[in-house]
A protein has these predicted regions:
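Histidine-/acidic-rich catalytic cores in large beta-rich domains
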Residues: 1-179
Length: 179
């Protein structure tokens, strides 16, 4: 006789919030990037509270007053790696109230030239050094400088005969100019 597989295999795969105990949680909201949708703000029950469509945060960050720091797209992957087109602060209704895209003017083959932030992975607005909620450390929403982690291409024959992708930290004034 053949021995059958005696291991149990699940037939139900829970999704969403499976256990929520408000007394044991730091209650709040979660913001995440849904590919091809936008920034989704969810409550502790896993319900969608707000969607900012057409943004591509890398990452998205919520600021006081319902503002969102995000990007509105990425550079074509054939020519850059994780280069944000811009870094923007938008209001609850999706209106741009601050923008930075003047890191580098990019002319990729077959694509109209444009200024890009080339931002990726991190940025901090004056007032908060953490980038997430911390009591007494709220980022400014109508002024202040912003630190932006960005890319620049470099050549250094002591390292490689190939073009290098380098990281830079830019400090950007509220008016969008680099310090």
């Amino acid at each position: 006789a053949m021995q059958e597989d005696m291991m149990g295999h699940p037939t139900i795969y829970p999704t969403g919030v499976t256990v929520y105990n408000p007394e044991k949680c730091w209650n709040g909201f979660t913001i995440f990037q849904a590919l091809e949708v936008g920034a989704v703000l969810m409550n502790m029950n896993g319900r969608e509270n707000k969607v900012w469509k057409g943004v591509h945060g890398f990452p998205n960050k919520i600021f006081p007053g319902g503002y969102l720091m995000t990007s509105r797209g990425s550079r074509d992957g054939r020519y850059g790696v994780q280069d944000g087109l811009d870094l923007v602060q938008i209001d609850w209704d999706g209106n741009v109230v601050w923008k930075f895209d003047r890191n580098e003017y990019i002319e990729d083959p077959g694509i109209p030239g444009r200024w890009m932030a080339r931002s990726h992975h991190d940025y901090q607005r004056e007032g908060s050094t953490t980038g997430y909620y911390a009591p007494g450390m709220e980022p400014k929403t109508d002024s202040g400088n912003t630190l932006v982690l960005a890319h620049r291409n470099a050549r250094n024959p002591k390292i490689s005969d190939k073009q290098l992708l380098d990281d830079v930290i830019l400090e950007v004034y509220w008016d969008g100019d680099i310090v």
